[in-house]
Amino acid sequence: MRGSSNKKIDPRIHYLVPKHEVLNIDEAYKILKELGIRPEQLPWIRASDPVARSINAKPGDIIRIIRKSQLYGEVVSYRYVISG
């Protein structure tokens, strides 16, 4: 067994992990209004997810995820943060 270390690995630095960002209230309201949905209707992400923890997302927040795609350039998706 290796010696324990307090180092924390930031999952956001891996090249396969897309950019995640927490939306502010105004941005979240605008997105929900454009889509015509309630926050609970978005796909969910748990607050315990490594990336959600690294960006300090809390239950009730909405996260914007920006993925790079060879076919479409950038693909934007949203997730609603739930407890767990």
From Swiss-Prot:
Keywords: Cytoplasm, DNA-directed RNA polymerase, Nucleotidyltransferase, Transcription, Transferase. One of its GO terms (molecular function) is DNA binding. GO terms for cellular component: cytoplasm; DNA-directed RNA polymerase complex. GO terms for biological process: DNA-templated transcription. The keyword Cell division does not apply. It catalyses: RNA(n) + a ribonucleoside 5'-triphosphate = RNA(n+1) + diphosphate. It is an enzyme of class 2 (transferase). Its EC number is 2.7.7.6. Belongs to the archaeal Rpo5/eukaryotic RPB5 RNA polymerase subunit family. NCBIfam families: PRK09570.1 (NF007129). DNA-dependent RNA polymerase (RNAP) catalyzes the transcription of DNA into RNA using the four ribonucleoside triphosphates as substrates. This is DNA-directed RNA polymerase subunit Rpo5. It comes from Saccharolobus solfataricus (strain ATCC 35092 / DSM 1617 / JCM 11322 / P2). The lineage of its organism: Archaea, Thermoproteota, Thermoprotei, Sulfolobales, Sulfolobaceae.
